[in-house]
């Protein structure tokens, strides 16, 4: 039963951090330092990825009408625009499929550690502050998803590759990239959400396939632990997404940049002292 409680904690962490630009993987790595499951390393590695399914389902539920090209409540033009949006999203995911799949295991093996996480937390924290200060007087070139060109969508997808490095934040990399290219904060955030659907569904499916291919099982407590983590991450992510969308209507991302810097410094201090 203790692992169920830990799954709740990890689900909360995942739900809060998945779509805020502060790195869910980085936070899960850090939380794992203090809350270790009494499960195999194989299961824990799978859990830390598949728990994202709950967060992704929160996006699907929140945007179901907007993302559903078959909705009977949409006219022909709206349905066509939805198909166009999906084509841009899928185009943006292609770089992650081509480059990310071959490198993913290598990145996990060599870069999943506190030193890399703390460095990327600080680096991207600084970038958020610098870019927001630079862009505050500029008018976005793309203020809605309909005007977002295919080439821009592809460039945003290339920025997603940076999130292969632990601690970067998938949403952080894509939002920063989109803002640099000239989208509004709101468009950057929504497009990042939509890119997460195929990206993270694919990552979770791949992790599950590898888990079962290597003899893994979800029998007994393990299945319950995973289910609890996914459900909790769904509920918390739903609330986090609503918060972020309201927040960026009136604020920029600098607060998240400062948070990343402070957390990165604390991580360096903590691990330097205990090791």
Swiss-Prot record:
InterPro entries: UppP. GO terms for biological process: cell wall organization; peptidoglycan biosynthetic process; regulation of cell shape; response to antibiotic. Catalyzes the dephosphorylation of undecaprenyl diphosphate (UPP). Confers resistance to bacitracin. GO terms for cellular component: plasma membrane. It is a multi-pass membrane protein. It catalyses: di-trans,octa-cis-undecaprenyl diphosphate + H2O = di-trans,octa-cis-undecaprenyl phosphate + phosphate + H(+). GO terms for molecular function: undecaprenyl-diphosphatase activity. The chain crosses the membrane at residues 2-22, 43-63, 83-103, 111-131, 147-167, 186-206, 221-241, 255-275. Its EC number is 3.6.1.27. HAMAP family: Undec_diphosphatase (MF_01006). It comes from Lactiplantibacillus plantarum (strain ATCC BAA-793 / NCIMB 8826 / WCFS1) (Lactobacillus plantarum). Bacitracin is thought to be involved in the inhibition of peptidoglycan synthesis by sequestering undecaprenyl diphosphate, thereby reducing the pool of lipid carrier available. Its main location: membrane. Keywords: Antibiotic resistance, Cell membrane, Cell shape, Cell wall biogenesis/degradation, Hydrolase, Membrane, Peptidoglycan synthesis, Transmembrane, Transmembrane helix. The gene is uppP. This is Undecaprenyl-diphosphatase. Belongs to the UppP family. It is found in: Cell membrane.
């Amino acid at each position: 039963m203790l692992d169920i409680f830990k799954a709740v904690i990890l689900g909360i962490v995942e739900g809060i951090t998945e779509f805020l630009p502060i790195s869910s993987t980085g936070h899960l790595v850090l939380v794992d330092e203090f809350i270790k499951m009494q499960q195999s390393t194989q299961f824990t590695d799978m859990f830390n990825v598949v728990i994202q399914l709950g967060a992704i389902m929160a996006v699907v539920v929140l945007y179901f009408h907007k993302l559903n090209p078959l909705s009977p409540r949409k006219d022909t033009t709206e349905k066509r625009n939805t198909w166009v949006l999906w084509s841009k999203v899928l185009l943006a995911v292609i770089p992650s499929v081509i480059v990310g799949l071959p490198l993913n295991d290598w990145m996990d093996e060599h870069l999943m550690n506190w030193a890399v996480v703390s460095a990327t937390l600080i680096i991207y924290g600084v970038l958020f502050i610098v870019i927001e200060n630079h862009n505050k007087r500029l008018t976005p070139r793309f203020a809605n998803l309909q005007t977002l060109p295919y080439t821009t969508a592809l460039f945003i997808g290339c920025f997603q590759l940076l999130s292969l490095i632990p601690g970067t934040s998938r949403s952080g990399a894509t939002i920063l990239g989109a803002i640099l290219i000239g989208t509004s904060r709101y468009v950057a955030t929504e497009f990042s959400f939509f890119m997460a659907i195929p990206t993270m569904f694919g990552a979770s499916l791949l992790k599950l396939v590898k888990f079962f291919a290597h003899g893994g099982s979800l029998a007994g407590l393990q299945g319950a632990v995973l289910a609890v983590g996914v459900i909790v991450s769904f509920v918390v992510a739903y609330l986090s997404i609503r918060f972020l969308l309201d927040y960026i209507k009136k604020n920029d991302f600098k607060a998240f940049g400062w948070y990343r810097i402070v957390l990165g410094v604390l991580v360096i201090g903590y691990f330097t002292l205990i090791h």
